[in-house]
Swiss-Prot record:
Cofactor(s) needed by this chain: [2Fe-2S] cluster
InterPro entries the UniProt entry points to: Cyt_b6_f_Rieske, Rieske_2Fe-2S, Rieske_2Fe-2S_sf, Rieske_Fe-S_prot, Rieske_Fe-S_prot_C
Transit peptide start and end: 1-51
Residue ranges constituting the Rieske domain according to the UniProt record: 116-212
GO annotation, cellular component aspect: chloroplast thylakoid membrane; plasma membrane
Domain of life: Eukaryota
Keyword line: 2Fe-2S, Chloroplast, Disulfide bond, Electron transport, Iron, Iron-sulfur, Membrane, Metal-binding, Plastid, Thylakoid, Transit peptide, Translocase, Transmembrane, Transmembrane helix, Transport
Name of the protein in question: Cytochrome b6-f complex iron-sulfur subunit, chloroplastic
Cofactor stoichiometry and binding remark: Binds 1 [2Fe-2S] cluster per subunit.
Topology with respect to the bilayer: Single-pass membrane protein
EC number: 7.1.1.6
Length: 230
């Protein structure tokens, strides 16, 4: 005799027979805790009819959730970092124009233009929050201690293998969850295996909107030419 456990509310296919209703994946069903004994001979002799049940609506991501997921790791300061183990991928929202500056308008988690004044109302000094930057790269906006935006943005892509690096506010540095690389609060590498500091972008305000512009000058953190512009 074989013992199976049935679930009374499994959102999958349910099979019925003259002997009752049961889920085809009997060995995997656990919620119901109802033990039923069925002999191998009876199982072989059953005539089964399967009927698919619908997935509850609250299990299906709505459009806003799916669009938000298209922006990789935005708002990562307040979220767990486990999901950041995925390799870096570009945002799916097309980068915005830079109002004739040659740059890109920063986008928030919903794909909206970042308005500098509004951003500063909701982000405290020392805050580092991801936005969409140049070429769609995830880029940190930095709020200085005097509650102004820093003149630079920090590209969040790890220089080791391309994971998106979260900012650890408790330790005041960026720590990559993939292989442990660490960067100081300005993105300068302080521990490998990452070989280089995080890339920079100029952060300007044009017509009230935050604009990222390519950084081609000396890296102020290292005193060297910017490797990302080579």
């Amino acid at each position: 005799m074989a013992s199976f456990t049935l679930s009374s509310a499994t959102p999958s296919q349910l099979c019925s027979s003259k002997n009752g209703m049961f889920a085809p994946s009997l060995a995997l069903a656990k919620a119901g805790r109802v033990n039923v004994l069925i002999s191998k001979e009876r199982i072989r002799g059953m005539k089964l009819t399967c009927q698919a049940t619908s997935i509850p609506a609250d299990n299906v991501p709505d459009m806003q959730k799916r669009e938000t997921l298209n922006l990789l790791l935005l708002g990562a300061l307040s979220l767990p970092t486990g999901y950041m183990l995925l390799p870096y991928a570009s945002f799916f929202v097309p980068p915005g124009g830079g109002a004739g500056t040659g740059g890109t308008i920063a986008k928030d988690a919903l794909g909206n233009d970042v308005i500098a004044a509004e951003w500063l109302k909701t982000h405290a000094p020392g805050d580092r929050t991801l936005t969409q930057g140049l070429k769609g790269d995830p880029t940190y906006l930095v709020v200085e201690s005097d509650k102004t935006l820093a003149t630079f943005g920090i590209n969040a892509v790890c220089t080791h293998l391309g994971c998106v690096v979260p900012f650890n506010a408790a330790e005041n540095k960026f720590i990559c969850p993939c292989h442990g690389s660490q960067y100081n609060n300005q993105g300068r590498v302080v521990r490998g295996p990452a070989p280089l500091s995080l890339a920079l972008a100029h952060c300007d305000v044009d017509d009230g909107k935050v604009v990222f512009v390519p950084w081609t000058e000396t890296d102020f953190r290292t005193g060297e030419a910017p490797w990302w512009s080579a």
